[in-house]
Amino acid sequence: MAAIELDGVTKRFEDITAVSDLSLTVDEGEVFGFLGPNGAGKSTTINILLDFVRPTSGTVTVLGHDTREESVAVRERTGVLPEGFDVYDRLTGRAHVEFAADSKAVDADPDAALERVGLADAAGRNAGGYSKGMRQRLVLAMALVGDPDLLILDEPSSGLDPAGAKEMREIVLSEAERGTTVFFSSHILEQVEAVCDRVGIMEAGEPAAVDSHHHLRAASGAHAALRTPRRPPLHHAPPPTPLAPDRAAPVRSAP
């Protein structure tokens, strides 16, 4: 069964086409890499999946729900790690997860959630003293509250050193082993090839290829990164909080 289905999706902002005729299927339990340079339409696609913006044309189904009709049901079963989201310096790691649980109105063991992302020993520390990698993992722990069926990760390795990026990939693999579907957006192929079953590439808002990372790497001459923007990125509202579906906001395109 498909976890994500997009059929002929196009999104225009006045005279700018952010996404053009995108058709894509992600199976349940799959780790899908969504690649493209900044401004390629990745963040707009994520916003469409979460019904933060409506497509100009096309249909979108997530976890069996039509996003236009059942967006709340989609967000209740989806955990989001948005690009650029930061933590509250004066709150402990445990308090962040407790707040996430309260916002989602679910029962959750904060220490168990932090254990899943390797932060059990830092649960009582204020997040202001966390490293960049620890902050990213804390936001992921918040996204995991409620055991979502789908994880959407928007540039989860952005700003991380190699060790931090490796830790993030290991967590993604661990969640995939639990049966979670993962939609992993990035502009660097090497960040997703170790964890993803398939990879889709976006260029200038259009789908360029969907295949295994092995075939895509061979076809691209072993290039590891997709860094050159085809056009300036679109800027939308600030990134969404991973806490409460009814208070989330659209994902912001990377500057």
Each model region followed by its residue ranges:
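ABC transporter nucleotide-binding domains
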Residues: 2-6, 11-203, 207-209
